[in-house]
Amino acid sequence: MNHTPNYSPKPEDFTPAHYDDDIHGIARPSRSYWQDAWRRLRANRRALVSLILIVGLLLFALIGPLLWQVDPSRQDIDQVSQAPGADRAASIVAPYEYWSGKSAPGFEGEGLRLAQEANSQAVRLLWDEVSSATSLRLYRNIFPIDEQLAFGLPIAEFASAGAGYYEDRLDLTPDTYYYSLVELDASGQSTGTFQSLAVEVKRVITIDEVRERQLVLDTTELNIGDEVLLALHPLGTDYLGRDILSRLMHGARVSLFIGFVAPMLYVLLGVAYGATAGFLGGKIDQVMMRFADFVVALPFLLFMILFQVVFGIGPGESGIIPLLVALIVLAWPATARLVRGQVLQIREEAYISASRLLGANSRYLVLRHMIPNTMGVILVTLTFAVPSAIFTEAFLSFIGMGVAPPTPSWGSMSNEGLATMLTHPHELIFPSVFISITVLAFNLLGDGLRDALDARMRDV
């Protein structure tokens, strides 16, 4: 057994230990529920990028028209279906003059030919006598003549097959046109013989048109042959020559107005209805929820048509008001069910019983305790309701039951772009991309909010 030697205490051994207040201090202030939710939302990159996109869309819709002050209904007939970044230069020419069928110097030749340089003012054609035909028919196409002999649009027919001329002024734009002069027999049927000519059309403008559109401040120095730049359209124009960027901005106002107003109203209605049903409980709750089930079973499209009839909306008239009413009347049950479930759970909590013992009435319990504690569910529901309303508006406008032309909306613009999808795809791509980005951004933000507001994931 080891023996410990005796130790004689010293005076310094009885000196009190140093007390450090920092050891027992709070490392960081306690976060509130909303502060912790915001921290977790910022940590979610997809949700944060979606939030930035949504803010950008709001700025695009609200501030964009103030910066890009172009009338969305104004038509630029010289730039119809113009693609983004296309050449917008135009040459100055003399005003239109009547043509008697004579060929300009340097354009002599045989067969189907140009009588002078082709431009967007007119394409003037000449041809020689065709002895093997009884009559002739002239076609115009925007595609080369293929093996199926698809000549395109018939623009003129001539009773004789003699030498002739024709002036085409039908909706000419800077493009390549393919003209075909088809020989016909006595019965008016094609003999299978034809002459074809590819014509490159050049954009032109007169000095009076330059002055009228204010393209150049001083037109006194302009001469025939000079070039001017037409109005700028960053995203191109549609089939009527309207600026797509301006229409997207004003269409965003319509789509986002419906996307925010309708969900706000029917979510509020659902919150009030669901909170009342969940708080009262019993038979009243059962009756109220059976009515909500009945509303869910109602067909939305049928009631949309009925509301249009009730509001006197005729063909070609805007159906924004019937659309809002239909969404508010028929879309609230989903929110009511969620809030009812939350209230049924919360009303059994101990702090609710304590509030009752302290004399709190029903209104105080609902407004002070139950609805604030369901705010996370309400915000997530609202976030998911916005893209649903935007997509519903786009779909109804696409089929002609929503916003009617000339009022722009993304859905109606997609419908108009569908007709020119093969030749001018930008008219369909831009509104479709905006619809897709908006719906995707709100859905991703809703996912992020659902995770951020989940109390089980909260840090202390």
Where on the chain are the PLM-derived regions?
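Transmembrane alpha-helices
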Residues: 253-267, 363-395, 442
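Generic hydrophobic transmembrane alpha-helix motif, especially the helices
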Residues: 234-238, 242-244, 255-272, 278-345, ...
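Short juxtamembrane loops and helix-capping segments at transmembrane helix boundaries
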Residues: 298-305, 395-427
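Gly/Trp-centered helix-boundary motif
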Residues: 1-267, 271, 389, 406, ...
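Transmembrane helix boundary and interhelical loop/hinge segments in multi-pass membrane proteins
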Residues: 342-351, 449-456
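Transmembrane alpha-helix boundary and packing residues in multipass membrane permease domains
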Residues: 57, 275, 305-309, 327, ...
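Hydrophobic alpha-helical interface/terminus motif in multipass membrane transporters
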Residues: 273-277, 307-311, 339, 352, ...
